[in-house]
């Protein structure tokens, strides 16, 4: 159950924060995604109300109306959504039965639980995508050690074991080295009540994502394919448009994303995470990895690199307003995550004024989080003409925000 800390202030929110007649969107979640929605809401003339676990949570620091509560508690959800024009999320972990109850009570969930279940349960997602003919690896439910053994045999040991629910940034995923390790894992996790599935490992060459926005009325808009680079299971950087993508593959990915959004009834932003690999003819091909029905880490570049950011678009979509232009504003945009390290670190806030000195176009976004190893505490966005140079400068600026020192002979003036 999520930690709830009242601290100072009214735990039941601040209704006076909203101008009469202004649409109120209830956001279930208090992380950096909700934090960045708040900026977009101000520009759109919308007002947000958060359901947050703590007054000092990332989004709660910047939102005037915060209801303190637990997203697994239906009564707390009711407090947060009372009077809201629409209800949306910055994570997929709200119990589906609670979301269904909200709809039955007359609230406007966007996306709706029938769509969101495909981002909550990986087996449900795989089964539905297979029905749609989307490219997915072989998969199977794993309910016993025998199931695990059978799948190991079927795939010649190319097994990725996953928790069906939860898990992100590399958590809830296991790559057993042998059959006995797999069956031991399954036995242990099953005893602990973890529902499991297995997939055949994909020999991928890089990771891509396509972001799609869809309104309840059915309008759809997509951004160009993005390449993401993972380090230790965590997204370290994203580059858009993804370099070296064949135009036909770009079109196929966009069509795939739009089909998934439409057929699943997704509203708001949908991120379709993709594995890229070489097919039998040697051409780059794609398979679906996972889905996220909310703004996504690989879409943060849109804050500076697109006419319409993913955060603005998400709020437009859940309100069933016309979608914005998704055209790019530069030949290349790079997002570099600011990740906490495990060594002595300087205060990242003190580093902000100097982080963009060598490249003034650097845009810093910090999340108001404490530093922990590997934790996403912010990101840097940078647009440019040259992919290699833009990647280098974005990485160095992100590194400086953690370590307060320039690496690779890059120095502030």
Curated annotation (Swiss-Prot):
Keywords: ATP-binding, Ligase, Nucleotide-binding, Purine biosynthesis. One of its GO terms (molecular function) is 5-(carboxyamino)imidazole ribonucleotide synthase activity. It is an enzyme of class 6 (ligase). It holds the Pfam family PurK_C. Pathway: Purine metabolism; IMP biosynthesis via de novo pathway; 5-amino-1-(5-phospho-D-ribosyl)imidazole-4-carboxylate from 5-amino-1-(5-phospho-D-ribosyl)imidazole (N5-CAIR route): step 1/2. Its EC number is 6.3.4.18. The keyword Nucleotide-binding applies. GO terms for cellular component: cytosol. It catalyses: 5-amino-1-(5-phospho-beta-D-ribosyl)imidazole + hydrogencarbonate + ATP = 5-carboxyamino-1-(5-phospho-D-ribosyl)imidazole + ADP + phosphate + 2 H(+). ATP binds at residues 122, 162, 199-202, 207, 289-290. One of its GO terms (biological process) is 'de novo' IMP biosynthetic process. Catalyzes the ATP-dependent conversion of 5-aminoimidazole ribonucleotide (AIR) and HCO(3)(-) to N5-carboxyaminoimidazole ribonucleotide (N5-CAIR). Homodimer. Belongs to the PurK/PurT family. This is N5-carboxyaminoimidazole ribonucleotide synthase. The gene is purK.
